[in-house]
């Protein structure tokens, strides 16, 4: 709802981590303009990414969070509106998501072919090297590699050569940042 959007923005910029205050700091004002519309007024300046940044705002349900202390850490799975819900977890180790059978968006054309698994389990590894070795040993099924050195050298293993592991570049066609070292060479 419009109330959820405004409440989320105001809560993140007042009670959220400093990251959110900085991230949304170029918004001067947010207000309702219609039954289902919200307007964000920007501060003067040259932040061309701000519309994209606001489009990434995760909307929180006001009715759920306003009766809880938003600033406190909790292990209670939050209320969501997506295709999966948290059904089991061990903090710092694993989390299991179960598909919501009556999810409101399941029949939308944009979701065709998505969210096909009944359960998804994420295992967490504190060390990237151990995670890579666990993947090679078949402990988990999917790995996104973002280190160019590992992409070039770490997957020269029998399971890649015989096709049990498929190493594939996947174009996602989304706007994203870059991975680089950028040096400030200005003298002033």
Question: Language-model features: where?
Answer:
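Stable alpha-helical elements in mature extracytoplasmic
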Residues: 1-9, 49, 80, 100, ...
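Aromatic- and charge-enriched surface segment that lines or borders ligand/interaction sites
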Residues: 1-18, 33, 39-41, 125, ...
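Sec-exported extracytoplasmic/periplasmic mature domains
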Residues: 10-17, 45-47, 65, 102, ...
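Short, solvent-exposed secondary-structure boundary motifs
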Residues: 15-24, 72-79, 159-164
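Surface-exposed binding/hinge segments that line
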Residues: 20-64, 83-90, 186
């Amino acid at each position: 709802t419009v109330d959820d959007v405004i409440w989320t923005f105001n809560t993140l910029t007042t009670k959220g981590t400093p990251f959110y205050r900085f991230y949304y700091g170029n918004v001067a004002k947010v207000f309702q303009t219609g039954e289902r519309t919200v307007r964000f007024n920007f501060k003067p300046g040259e932040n061309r990414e701000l519309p994209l940044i606001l489009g990434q705002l995760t909307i929180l349900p006001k009715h759920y969070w306003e009766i809880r202390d938003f600033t406190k850490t909790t292990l209670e799975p939050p209320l969501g509106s997506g295709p999966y819900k948290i059904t089991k977890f061990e903090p710092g180790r694993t989390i299991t998501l179960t598909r919501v059978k009556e999810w409101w968006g399941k029949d939308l054309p944009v979701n065709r072919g998505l969210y096909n698994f009944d359960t998804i389990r994420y295992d967490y590894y504190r060390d990237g090297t151990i995670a890579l070795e666990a993947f090679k040993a078949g402990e988990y099924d999917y790995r996104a590699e973002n280190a160019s050195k590992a992409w070039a050298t770490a997957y020269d293993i029998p399971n890649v050569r015989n096709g049990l592991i498929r190493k594939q570049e996947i174009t996602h066609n989304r706007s994203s940042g870059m991975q680089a070292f950028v040096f400030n060479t200005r003298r002033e």
